[in-house]
């Protein structure tokens, strides 16, 4: 019954979603009880797609339940229609989306990895040694990005763009330089 009444609404929302300029996506494990032909402990996946206030579409969150984490799910969901920016984590499936979709990374996901590294390093490093690590320096730079975003939160999209170009872009370039330099040093 729910499928009969809600599926048409979901499809209309998805059409609107696919017309947006900016979208976000993520996937998470879901344990489903009494799924046909599966054990109760089987992990399935909820793929989540959302628009935000800058997307050019109404704000919405769409959920797509799948039995696997296979990379074709976001490709199928976005279909031949979506064309714009898609913010997501580093999961490889998103990076195999068609070229008409510009994949952008999520700073919160990147930050989480550096924070996890710091948690491990804190066991064996002094505070002074920690400050020299790439993880610490990356966290400090990410903190600066967050401060910039907080300062420009209430500005128009055009004003935010200008401020990001002026303030965040040089920081981002330095951030990537730090990571590339660190990566090259780790290879030697």
Question: Model-found features: residue ranges?
Answer:
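RNase H-like nuclease fold core
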Residues: 3-88, 92
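Single, function-defining residue in the core of a domain
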Residues: 93-95, 146
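Single conserved hydrophobic/aromatic residue that forms the stacking wall/gate
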Residues: 180-188
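Core structural elements
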Residues: 166-176
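A conserved active-site cap/scaffold subdomain adjacent to cofactor or substrate pockets
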Residues: 118, 130-149
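Conserved beta-strand -> loop -> alpha-helix junction used to position metal-binding or nucleic-acid-contacting
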Residues: 99-126
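A generic secondary-structure signal for well-formed alpha-helical elements
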Residues: 2-13, 17-20, 114, 118-121, ...
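Conserved protein kinase catalytic core
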Residues: 32, 95, 115
